[in-house]
Amino acid sequence: MKELILTLQKEIIVPVEMDKVLPEVIENMSLEEIKNIELVQGRKRIKVADIFDVELNDIEGEPRIVIKNSSPKLKYIGSKMTKGEIVVEGDAGMYVGAEMKGGKIVVNGNAESWAGQNMKGGELLIKGNAGDYVGSAYRGDWRGMSGGTIIVEGNAGNEIGEFMSKGLIHIKGNVGIMAGIHQNGGIIIIDGDVDVRVGGEMKAGAIVVYGKVEEILPSFKFEGIVENPVIKLSKKDAGTPIAGTFYKFSGDYVYNKPKGQLYISVDSNPDLI
């Protein structure tokens, strides 16, 4: 298989869309063919070799792309990818991993907003911070993340998991407002603190918060205190065990018969109830 190493030659101002450079695309291409792949930059089209130094190696296993000296101006990295691996050495722009179906993306830096948007499968690992709308839907759409795993080792912004229906989002830092808004399934785990309106208008799925919460919406029902719960999202679900002692809430009761589950750490929120 092929390993493609792209080294950004200099700082770019106008964003470049990287959705044409995918592991499954380059695995059967020659070096010259890769250099001539067209990318959209603003109102014009450029070639890969116009902004990158390009190196192609033979490796064992799945096809792999490494982007060195990366920039937040590089958008749509790994968009719709189905296999292989992409490693981003630096920051990634908006829509990294959007609609990805398989494979793995590792961002050794921060990611801009809409990381993993409408993600369907695969794994997205962000070792820095992420912007707003992690694992969310497109503007005006009601279909968010439907599979796969997103892990953010830093903080994330607002409205993570919007309209999420399946999969896992794990934020190891803090998050902003409206985490899990309109959530329809899947699990969101937040190790840090959460701002207001967590789980707003969720119908199903689960949100676990180990840090502090600013509030619980009045449309959620307190179900009691649970220890080391096993989260089951359906009758056939084997369950996901969660360590700790939690306040359990159900909701959001702005809907009829909601199945959403909130688990809020007792240790971090001793005065919540």
Curated annotation (Swiss-Prot):
Sequence repeats lie at residues 78-90, 97-109, 116-128, 142-154, 161-173, 180-192, 199-211. One of its GO terms (molecular function) is formylmethanofuran dehydrogenase activity. Its EC number is 1.2.7.12. Keywords: Methanogenesis, Oxidoreductase, Repeat. One of its GO terms (biological process) is methanogenesis, from carbon dioxide. Pathway: One-carbon metabolism; methanogenesis from CO(2); 5,10-methenyl-5,6,7,8-tetrahydromethanopterin from CO(2): step 1/3. Residues 78-211 are annotated as: 7 X 13 AA repeats of [GW]-X-X-[MQ]-X-X-G-X-[IL]-X-[IV]-X-G. InterPro entries: FMH_DH_FwdC (IPR054942), Formylmethanofuran_DH_suC (IPR017550), Glu_synth_asu_C (IPR002489), Glu_synth_asu_C_sf (IPR036485). Gene3D superfamilies: Glutamate synthase, alpha subunit, C-terminal domain (2.160.20.60). It catalyses: N-formylmethanofuran + 2 oxidized [2Fe-2S]-[ferredoxin] + H2O = methanofuran + 2 reduced [2Fe-2S]-[ferredoxin] + CO2 + H(+). It holds the Pfam family GXGXG. Belongs to the FwdC/FmdC family. Catalyzes the reversible oxidation of CO(2) and methanofuran (MFR) to N-formylmethanofuran (CHO-MFR). This enzyme is oxygen-labile. This enzyme is composed of six subunits FwdA, FwdC, FwdD, FwdE, FwdF and FwdG. This is Tungsten-containing formylmethanofuran dehydrogenase 2 subunit C. It comes from Methanocaldococcus jannaschii (strain ATCC 43067 / DSM 2661 / JAL-1 / JCM 10045 / NBRC 100440).
